[in-house]
Amino acid sequence: MQKALEAYLKEVFGTSVKLLEFQRLGAGVHGAGFLLKIDTEDGIKSYVLKDLAPEGLGHDYPSDRAAVFLLAQETYGRLPKHVKAIDVISMKDDGTMKSIGGGVDYFLLMEMAEGENYFIDLSEFSNKDILDERDRNKIEAMTSYLAEIHSVKKDSKTLYWRKLRDTVGHGECLMGVFDSYPDGTLPYNEMAEIVKKSVDWIAKLKPKFKRLSQIHGDFHPGNIWFSLTPNSELRTKIDFILLDRSRGPWGDPADDVTALTINYIFFSIKHLGTVRGPYLEGLRLFFERYVTLTGDDELLSLVAPFYAFRGAVVANPIFYPELTPDHRKLIFRFVNNVLDDERFRPESVNDYLR
């Protein structure tokens, strides 16, 4: 690390800089600090290099720690009498160190996906009486994929609890989505009731940390793009590519399963006012195939808080302005009734709308 740090310092302070001292100052719950004493053209200067301990306090992933330091660099110098942050430094896989600080915004460059997203299929279900072979093959492809990625497990109570906490409290999840609602969409006390029920579910699920699995994190129809050419790697007649993996690579498989299956319910309510036809068939088939492939029958006993989050998403007027107030009421009724039930029953989904 010291050689990499010396190379970084020469880039920032000039090639004549010399690292005179590099020693650990101490460590606490959050992380450790290191004293840097360097000889520059302007004289000897002392700095502190700070790190954050992984796993715990929301610092579980490198991106978490980067976010803390980027905010620190942005805000330290704006408060009177506060020490100033000089830079934010990243360490690469090869051990080299590089500045990532000073940006006013950040961007992600990624590959382009081609094909048709699964929203198109869900809309077309409204014109069918039953699923056709291609519809069933797509569900087979999606459940097979999820069964495969969810088979990768990780032993970490911290990360499982983090995912449970984020499902309710993250800015992109239940509470954050509710905060984005236009006033009048749902009374605040009704939002709070859903949140409180979800928190109670989190307490029930905490002992289930052995379920921690590799997940996509946002497995919804807009992020699933089906191609027109088959791929033998999936061993199916259908292939797809995914977008926008989100909010961490580890969690409960219920996160991915509910992200997709809420849409059979949502689209059916939107088009038909109840859950029936190809939508009900798709919902049942998805759970049937997934449980058969994974043996994870327990999943049906813990989907409730994940459905609360996903229900809040599809009922959001900002995301789906075409939804009528009556349809939103059905979705919120579904959410509350699922939260009140001990086990989700896909075959009786319409009972949750009453």
Question: Where are the regions a protein language model picked out?
Answer:
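Active-site activation/catalytic loop segments of kinase-like enzymes and analogous catalytic loops
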Residues: 247-250, 254-294, 308-326
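A glycine-centered beta->alpha junction motif in the catalytic cores
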Residues: 54-55, 112-131, 175-184, 266, ...
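Active-site catalytic-loop/activation-segment of kinase and kinase-like phosphoryl-transfer enzymes
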Residues: 111-113, 159-204, 316
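Conserved ATP-binding subdomain of kinase catalytic cores across diverse folds
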Residues: 29-32, 39, 44-168
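Conserved protein kinase catalytic core
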Residues: 56, 117, 224, 250, ...
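Regulatory N- and C-terminal appendages and interdomain linkers associated
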Residues: 1-47, 56, 60-67, 79-85, ...
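All-alpha amphipathic helical-bundle segments outside canonical DNA-binding/catalytic cores
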Residues: 295-307
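Active-site acidic catalytic loop and adjacent metal/ATP-binding pocket
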Residues: 24-39, 43-44, 48, 149, ...
